[in-house]
Structures are given as structure tokens and as C-alpha cells.
Amino acid sequence: MASLATFQVENDIVDVDSTPQQGFDRDDLYKYDDVEQKAILAAHPWRTDPSYFRNVLVSSIALVKMAMHARSGGAIEVMGMMTGKILPNTFVVMDCYPLPVEGTETRVNAQQEGIEFMVEYLQGLKDVGRRENIVGWYHSHPGYGCWLSGIDVDTQFQNQQFQEPFLAVVVDPNRTISAGKVEIGAFRTYPKDYKPPKKATKQNQDQSVPLSKAKDYGAHSERYYELDVSFFKSSLDENLLQLLWNKNWAATLSQSTIQLNHDYTSKLMLDLSEKNAQLAIGLGEKTPQSQGRGFREAMSKADNEPHTNLLNYSTKGQWEAVNRSVKDGVQIGSDELQGLMSLEIQRRLFGRAK
């Protein structure tokens, strides 16, 4: 179907039947070699190189299942486990499954019932001849991007202490709907007392984080690093993908992103308003009635004096915050415009949109 093809193109899912991924062909990815896996585990090179793992290869099946599970949680965080294997410098995620855990809008933790479910699920895999082991966990960040909070870092650090090698993946379902591409990130923590290079801890400055999360965002960046994520499939995956997709094809055609993400968009606009209010105060404004005047005066002076540097009127950090605020506003407007366009197309095709 066209929508499935679009999903695969948007997420750059590579067919390994014809194009190897990260130097690994189809047999490397799909064949489980017990001897090879035991040799890698026995060598445990990640103990001497904290950044040994640099890449994550995720199957198209696992990607779709994680995205659907994250979306099903709405504003509540969900959690699941990933199964697969290890290759040199690389995690291979073949499949995933959700955990029956209780989450909130800010955190999710596996309790005793979740641990019991994991044990039973792994035994079920062995019973049907699936030899993949757990290689990590995933959870959702509804609306606030892919990064690790302090709680996430502590959870991942403990997992790496007792279940190495282990990976943490974060999915943002709200931004996935807005962008049409799965918003996903993969991370690992550094050993205790390890000091990583500064460039390794620099997070994506273009990532927009809600004001309520700003304090936690980046506060633990020296404790973990991000891995490159890419996606793969084979011709054997096509039937499974079609089955997964066909369960939701009607909703895919009839639903509008502008309506699905209505609450999320409202929160984005409110958050942007609060950020702008703080920026105005930081730029010298003291009252709500005069917010924005200081920045307009600085812009006017810069227009009249071409060599004027706006950094003279605000600190570098404030100017970067203004730049991010502008980008956030443009992104919100762009997403809304695309949503309105898709809504109009659906109305012309079906007469109305749900």
C-alpha cells in the first residue's frame, strides 16, 4: 500500500536482500550463530572501550511495533523489551514486546509482574526455536523528544551493570505523528567516574524540549552517549509488515494528524508562549505589557547599524534561546499547515475526515 511505502521511505528502511547495512548482509543480520555470540560475549570488548557500541540496526517489524506501542500509551509513558543479537560495534534489534507496567506522564518502571512476564516471554521464544536474547529496553517520551532523563540514566546504568550488553531506546509518539517519521534515539551509559570527551556529550541543540523538562535535559549528558540508528528489512518481512499495516490502514487513510495531535500542539504553543515570556524578561523586559519591546528595539538598531552585533544586547545563551524559539514557532506552523493540507485532501477524497 502507498502509505506503507511512504512509511518505509520516510524512515529510510533499507532492503538488505540487495543492500548490506553497516557492512552486514542478510545472513549476518538474520542468522543466529551461537558460537559467534558466545565468542563476542566472552571477549566483552565493551569493558575496555566505553564507546565500543556505535550503531544500532533495527528491523522494520520492531520499528513498527515500538511506534504503535508508544502511540497506544497516549500521554502516558510505556515500556517494552527488545530482542536480538550483538555484532561487532553493533546492536541488532530483531523484535520487541511490550511490558505490562504502570507508567505516568514522566516515568515508567518495571515491577515484579513485568520481570515475570519477561522470563515467560523468553521461555516462549526458546520453545518456538527463537534463540535471540534480550538486548535492551525501550520506552516512550510523549512530546518531549528522545534523550535520557536522570531516572532513565540510572535505570540504564543498572541494566548495564548486570545485563551487559544492554541498550536503551526512546521513542516520541507525538513527534512521530507530526513528522511522519519515527522519532527514535538509542543510548548507552558510561562507566562510573569515566570522563568522556566533550564532543561526545554535546546533544542536538536543535531539539526542542518543554520548559518543564529543560532542567533535566542535558543535566546528565556526561553520563551517556547516543548511537547511530538505522533500519532494515528483507523480502521475508514484507508479509509481516503488510499484516501489521492492514490492521490500521483505514485509520491511516481517514485520520488527520492535525486532529490526532490537537492536545500536543496546544501544549507546544503554550510552552512556546512561556519560553518567550521568560526570554522577554531576560532581555530586559519587566512587565507582561512590555514583553518583546527590548528585542524589537535591538532588531531595529541592528537594521539601522549594519555592523551592530545583536549579541551586544543579550548574552550568547539568550540569543541561542531566541533562535531556538523562532525555530520552534516555524516548526509548529509548518506542522499545522501540513495537517490542514492532509485534512483537505481527505475531505475531497472521502467527503469528511474523522
From Swiss-Prot:
Keywords: Cytoplasm, Hydrolase, Metal-binding, Metalloprotease, Nucleus, Protease, Signalosome, Zinc
Record localization: Cytoplasm; Nucleus
Transmembrane regions listed in the UniProt entry: none
Motif (JAMM motif): 139-152
Any matching Pfam family: JAB
Residue ranges of every copy of the MPN domain listed in the record: 56-193
GO biological process, one term: proteolysis
UniProt keyword annotation of Metal-binding present: yes
EC main group: hydrolase
Positions contributing to Zn(2+) binding: 139, 141, 152
Enzyme Commission number(s) from the entry: 3.4.-.-
GO molecular function, one term: deNEDDylase activity
Ranges for region Disordered: 193-212
Principal place of residence: cytoplasm
GO CC list: COP9 signalosome; cytoplasm
SUBUNIT field: Component of the COP9 signalosome (CSN) complex.
PANTHER family reported in the protein's UniProt record: EUKARYOTIC TRANSLATION INITIATION FACTOR 3 -RELATED
Record note on domains: The JAMM motif is essential for the protease activity of the CSN complex resulting in deneddylation of cullins. It constitutes the catalytic center of the complex.
Family from the record: Belongs to the peptidase M67A family. CSN5 subfamily.
Role of this protein: Catalytic Component of the COP9 signalosome (CSN) complex that acts as an regulator of the ubiquitin (Ubl) conjugation pathway by mediating the deneddylation of the cullin subunit of SCF-type E3 ubiquitin-protein ligase complexes.
Protein's name in the database: COP9 signalosome complex subunit 5
Gene: RRI1
